Amino acid sequence: MTEKVLKKHLKEKYGDFSLVRLTGGYTNDTFLLNGTLPPLVVKVTNKFNEDIENEINCLNLIQETGVTPKIYELIETDALQIIVMEYRKGINGQSILDNNELERTKELYKNLGASLAKRIHSIKYNYTSSGIRECTFNEFNLSLDFVPEFLIANSMEILQNINDNKEEWVLTHGDYGIHNVLYTDTNTLTVLDWEWSEWANPLTDIGWVCWFTKLHYPEYADSLNLLFIKEYKINNPIHLSPEVLRSYCVYKVWKVLHKVKKAPQEVQEEWIRRLKWTIETDIFNFVLMN
């Protein structure tokens, strides 16, 4: 069905092609158009997907940095949105660590830090959203009936460490990390999947990289996160507090909990587990916080 729809809307302009489904860093239905020159990627989503509208606005804003694929065209059908974008070379960053290529992973984490500081967080909020979400921390609702009361109470206490100030906001990716990048042999980094991007404090992205690494790769987390933060601070000398970083991680987990409030019970239970883990775990127990 998808191939039929895509050929109907794309064949006349881009020529004949076959579809190759892409995984590793791409979400939704994402395909390589095999046979086009130059190679193209299309992302296919439900027409009423607000996350995709947010992503498109973000990609248009950040296009000149070179850290994202270029958008060539947006096609809307009765039921779908089809985004035609540039194909970028590279392998999924997470697969490098999964294959135990530790030295290359170290270089990747340095690149993650430098790119985040120089090419993403360098875009400051100027009190105009440009169609990109704005952080809602100051109006955040912790009332979800499937979350245990003691976790709500603990979260409220931790979130008091945050003093959210729009003057500190920058463009944030929202789910930044090795799982959402492509990385080449020449150390070129492409950042994918900007659906969760928002204007927010830069600590949301910094904390989330460390959170993801500690959750999934605890044996490597401290050394890799230290490399990431060192490189970030070389390019953006920012004050980092373990307490505030953890608070922003709790905020991020709550944002996901709101996204899964209609999801199956096992999905909700997994994110409740992650909230408890975030509250109890010393994620930022390495040096270089000042």
Which sequence ranges carry the predicted segments?
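An alpha-helical support segment within catalytic cores of ATP-dependent transferases
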Residues: 2-13, 121-174, 184, 271, ...
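Short, glycine/acidic-enriched loop or turn micro-motifs at the edges of active sites
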Residues: 46, 89, 176-178, 196, ...
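Conserved N-terminal boundary motif of the eukaryotic protein kinase catalytic domain
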Residues: 13-21
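Active-site acidic catalytic loop and adjacent metal/ATP-binding pocket
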Residues: 30-33, 159-204
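Conserved strand-to-helix beginnings and helix N-cap segments that scaffold or border functional pockets
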Residues: 52-56, 203, 222
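Glycine-rich, phosphate-binding/catalytic loops in enzymes
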Residues: 59, 101-102, 190, 207-209, ...
